[in-house]
Amino acid sequence: MSDIMNIDSIISRLLEVRGARPGKNVQLSESEIRSLCLKSREIFLSQPILLELEAPLKICGDIHGQYYDLLRLFEYGGFPPESNYLFLGDYVDRGKQSLETICLLLAYKIKYAENFFLLRGNHECASINRIYGFYDECKRRYTIKLWKTFTDCFNCLPVAAIVDEKIFCCHGGLSPDLSSMEQIRRIMRPTDVPDQGLLCDLLWSDPDKDTMGWGENDRGVSFTFGAEVVGKFLQKHEFDLICRAHQVVEDGYEFFAKRQLVTLFSAPNYCGEFDNAGAMMSVDDTLMCSFQILKPADKRRFVYPNFGSSGRPLTPPRGANNKNKKK
């Protein structure tokens, strides 16, 4: 693979725009991007679908194509291999630089396979990113064929991680079908995200303070789950914390169920529509968790397309009144 692809050259070109005007594109060749997809796919399949990781590491939530904010996260937390990372999914869609975002993440995965980890989000799925921006970006800047190559790669991403046997991480949340970790390990890849069931729930479900047990999800997919479900899950599996993403939260992180679950969202000033901060959670060797906050940048400098006006509903912050279906 190294004959075809110089990974250091790719990373260095992707990082060249640091300090440039936000929004400046990095145009890798189509064959380089294809190689990133194929090589990372190989690595994903060689590692478990349920990762078992060790602290210290930094955990990040949704990025959604906000490439310059991803660079800010690395500036804050340390560019790999200075720190170990776990990302919780939703790399593409909504923001205008999904390609740079996913290419840098895949490049780091290839270069630092044992220290840099990516989970699958609900947007790493063809039926979703066909609609919410990634397909259009691939088609405009490259080809539809390249978008299909990304789909093949996304279908092999791991879906959950356990940090030091104590912190359970996934993109969305719990599932009424989940009773043993072995069920996650048995999910075969490559796989699309089904409309229901365990894999769907891990990527789509949401905690909800008004739900007792399991409830209907306003997204029109999966379920909501209450604090009691969280407590029972942690007790049964001897975990201390659930760490998930999937929802915009004002401060970049938000606790639920007496600090037994935390939501992380790492795209500040989401799509230029919200005033939310972004956050990254640092887990030290003793499993102490602390949060690094990215304040929303000056809106005039960060211009993201207003998808709200082109029929692509935004994910509302938790507690917002405007409830959108399937996001």
Curated annotation (Swiss-Prot):
<dbReference type="GO" id="GO:0030514">
    <property type="term" value="P:negative regulation of BMP signaling pathway"/>
</dbReference>
<feature type="binding site">
    <location>
        <position position="64"/>
    </location>
    <ligand>
        <name>Mn(2+) 1</name>
    </ligand>
</feature>
<feature type="binding site">
    <location>
        <position position="90"/>
    </location>
    <ligand>
        <name>Mn(2+) 2</name>
    </ligand>
</feature>
<keyword id="KW-0464">Manganese</keyword>
<comment type="subunit">
    <text>Interacts with Nop17l.</text>
</comment>
<dbReference type="InterPro" id="IPR029052">
    <property type="entry name" value="Metallo-depent_PP-like"/>
</dbReference>
<dbReference type="GO" id="GO:0050829">
    <property type="term" value="P:defense response to Gram-negative bacterium"/>
</dbReference>
<feature type="region of interest" description="Disordered">
    <location>
        <begin position="308"/>
        <end position="327"/>
    </location>
</feature>
<dbReference type="GO" id="GO:0045089">
    <property type="term" value="P:positive regulation of innate immune response"/>
</dbReference>
<keyword id="KW-0904">Protein phosphatase</keyword>
<dbReference type="GO" id="GO:0045879">
    <property type="term" value="P:negative regulation of smoothened signaling pathway"/>
</dbReference>
<dbReference type="InterPro" id="IPR006186">
    <property type="entry name" value="Ser/Thr-sp_prot-phosphatase"/>
</dbReference>
<dbReference type="GO" id="GO:0005634">
    <property type="term" value="C:nucleus"/>
</dbReference>
<keyword id="KW-0597">Phosphoprotein</keyword>
<keyword id="KW-0479">Metal-binding</keyword>
<dbReference type="GO" id="GO:0090263">
    <property type="term" value="P:positive regulation of canonical Wnt signaling pathway"/>
</dbReference>
<dbReference type="InterPro" id="IPR004843">
    <property type="entry name" value="Calcineurin-like_PHP_ApaH"/>
</dbReference>
<protein>
    <recommendedName>
        <fullName>Serine/threonine-protein phosphatase alpha-1 isoform</fullName>
        <ecNumber>3.1.3.16</ecNumber>
    </recommendedName>
</protein>
<comment type="similarity">
    <text>Belongs to the PPP phosphatase family. PP-1 subfamily.</text>
</comment>
<dbReference type="GO" id="GO:0000164">
    <property type="term" value="C:protein phosphatase type 1 complex"/>
</dbReference>
<feature type="binding site">
    <location>
        <position position="171"/>
    </location>
    <ligand>
        <name>Mn(2+) 2</name>
    </ligand>
</feature>
<feature type="binding site">
    <location>
        <position position="122"/>
    </location>
    <ligand>
        <name>Mn(2+) 2</name>
    </ligand>
</feature>
<dbReference type="GO" id="GO:0046872">
    <property type="term" value="F:metal ion binding"/>
</dbReference>
<dbReference type="InterPro" id="IPR050341">
    <property type="entry name" value="PP1_catalytic_subunit"/>
</dbReference>
<dbReference type="GO" id="GO:0004722">
    <property type="term" value="F:protein serine/threonine phosphatase activity"/>
</dbReference>
<keyword id="KW-0378">Hydrolase</keyword>
<feature type="modified residue" description="Phosphothreonine">
    <location>
        <position position="315"/>
    </location>
</feature>
<dbReference type="InterPro" id="IPR031675">
    <property type="entry name" value="STPPase_N"/>
</dbReference>
<dbReference type="GO" id="GO:0005979">
    <property type="term" value="P:regulation of glycogen biosynthetic process"/>
</dbReference>
<feature type="binding site">
    <location>
        <position position="62"/>
    </location>
    <ligand>
        <name>Mn(2+) 1</name>
    </ligand>
</feature>
<dbReference type="Pfam" id="PF16891">
    <property type="entry name" value="STPPase_N"/>
</dbReference>
<dbReference type="GO" id="GO:0005829">
    <property type="term" value="C:cytosol"/>
</dbReference>
<dbReference type="GO" id="GO:0005737">
    <property type="term" value="C:cytoplasm"/>
</dbReference>
<dbReference type="Pfam" id="PF00149">
    <property type="entry name" value="Metallophos"/>
</dbReference>
<feature type="active site" description="Proton donor">
    <location>
        <position position="123"/>
    </location>
</feature>
<dbReference type="GO" id="GO:0005981">
    <property type="term" value="P:regulation of glycogen catabolic process"/>
</dbReference>
<feature type="binding site">
    <location>
        <position position="90"/>
    </location>
    <ligand>
        <name>Mn(2+) 1</name>
    </ligand>
</feature>
<feature type="binding site">
    <location>
        <position position="246"/>
    </location>
    <ligand>
        <name>Mn(2+) 2</name>
    </ligand>
</feature>
